[in-house]
Every structure is written in C-alpha cells, then in structure tokens.
Amino acid sequence: MFPAVSFRIPTAWRVQGRIEDVADILSKPEEFPRWWGEVYLSVTTTKPGDAQGIGQTVAVHSKGWLPYRLNWQGTLVENHMPTSWTVEATGDLVGRGIWTLSQHGDTAEIDYDWSVRSDRLLFRVLAPLLRWVMVSNHRWAMAKGERGLQAELARRAGA
C-alpha cells in the first residue's frame, strides 16, 4: 500500500583545508560521533576492509532533528582517496553515498551525492506528505557535518 520512498540529496561543502586532510577525517567514520555528534550517535567497525579499505563495514546509529533514529550499515565499495570514494548503505537506508573532493586554492570542495531508499514504514507513510521535511532533516544533518568538519580541521591544525 505504501511503496518504498527514494531520496537523492546532493550536498556541497566548502571548507578551508587540504583534501588530503578532509579525506583522512572522512575516512574514519568511527570518529564521526566526536566531531559530528549531533547526528552520529555511534559508529562501530563490524568488518575490516582490505589494504585499500574496500569492504570495511560500519554499523551506524544516527539521527536528525526529527524524532526518529536510523540504524544502518555503511560499506566502502570504491576507494580513490583523496578525491573520491563510495559507501553502500543497507538497513533502514539502502543505497549509495558518493564523496567527491577537489582542491581550489586553500579551499577543499566536498560534494556528497546521497541516493537512498527506505522501506521503513514511517518513511513510506510520511513521505507523500512530508517529503520536504525529511529532506530538510538531511540538510540540517549535513550542515552540522560541514561545521563539525571545519572545526575538526582547525583542531588538527592547532595540534
């Protein structure tokens, strides 16, 4: 009666820093709760990857400003760091997130293409009426990530 709901939400971040440092931070999802704690409640590695990290899987417990929590797994399926990598999501969210980084002077440009669907009943029921709210929730979460990433880069630079 209520079909799965799909989302494709691109995000663009601009931070002061080098893409090598950004990629190093973003390639350690188990540290997300420390600097992106408004969204990532816990991230635990459940499977190590190969020498390039391919196959590494993490269990994620996350939230936004809406009153629900998500449990999902992220697996690194492509790795061309520091310029791009792809994570496959399963669980409450199913799909892919593709990170693409480029350097422009002292600015790191980070593009994230999040393309997922959810079979979760809550999303299937609410999406026809409140899709814009759910997209806004994701944008809020990503804005927290951009601010947290900039702060983490500054922290590392001062260390």
Predicted feature descriptions by range:
Residues 16, 79-81, 104:
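Structural motif
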Residues 86-143:
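Beta-strand/loop substructures that line and gate deep hydrophobic ligand-binding cavities in soluble
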